[in-house]
Design a protein with these regions (language model features):
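C-terminal regulatory/oligomerization modules of transcriptional regulators
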Residues: 62-63, 68-83, 138, 174-175
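C-terminal peripheral helix-coil segments that are non-catalytic and often amphipathic
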Residues: 100, 104-116, 125-175
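Amphipathic alpha-helical packing segments from all-alpha helical-bundle domains
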Residues: 72-112
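Hydrophobic alpha-helical connector segments
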Residues: 18, 34-68, 124-127
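A short secondary-structure junction motif
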Residues: 2, 26, 30, 55, ...
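Amphipathic alpha-helical segments enriched in hydrophobic/aromatic and basic residues
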Residues: 12, 16-23
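Helix-turn-helix
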Residues: 1-14
């Protein structure tokens, strides 16, 4: 029941933070599993893009959590976890650490691909947010994406790959 939840969380926002953090930790775990035997940084980045841009199905081997439902919650409510007046205090309490850890993991792949790229962490966080935004648009606001005939995650993957590799392969301009 809702009353029972408040034994563990002081309010709904804290519950949302817990769920969002669980999701980002799970995504990092998935990324580690998918890339542990991959040697090339380009393939690791492509794997990260694929994991972030494709829909999540529930894994019946994990009865304690419904991954598809968790993904849907993060897609529709996740931004509310940090778009608050107390974001600095929450950050100081390390409530966004799982998201930062996932960004750092992907930033490592970016640095390995192009050690001279100046903004690996920014590109990594942008890639994550863009993957979620594009997936959300595909599901709920299809005119924002101008998809061909059907909802196609491959379009999102191609777009993200062009954006990410285009940014990393573009020569840096000096001031």
């Amino acid at each position: 029941t809702e009353a029972g939840i408040y034994r563990y969380f002081e309010n709904k926002h804290r519950l949302l933070l817990y769920l969002v953090d669980w999701y980002w930790s799970w995504q990092e775990y998935r990324l580690l599993q998918e890339t542990k035997n991959v040697t090339g940084p380009k393939t690791k980045i492509q794997t990260a893009i694929r994991l972030l841009a494709t829909k999540v199905e529930d894994d019946i081997s994990t009865g304690h959590i419904n991954e598809k439902l968790l993904h849907n919650i993060v897609m529709s409510e996740g931004a509310k976890s940090w778009l608050t007046k107390h974001v600095e205090a929450d950050n100081k309490d390390k409530l966004f650490q799982p998201f930062k850890d996932l960004c750092a993991r992907i930033a490592e792949f970016i640095k390995a691909y192009n050690p001279k790229y100046a903004f690996p962490f920014s590109l990594s966080s942008t890639m994550i947010e863009m993957a979620h935004s594009q997936h959300f648009y595909m599901q709920h606001l299809p005119s924002m994406k101008k998809l061909k005939k059907k909802k196609n995650e491959e379009d999102i993957i191609r777009f993200l790959e062009q954006m990410v590799f285009g940014a990393m392969d573009c020569p840096a301009k000096s001031k």
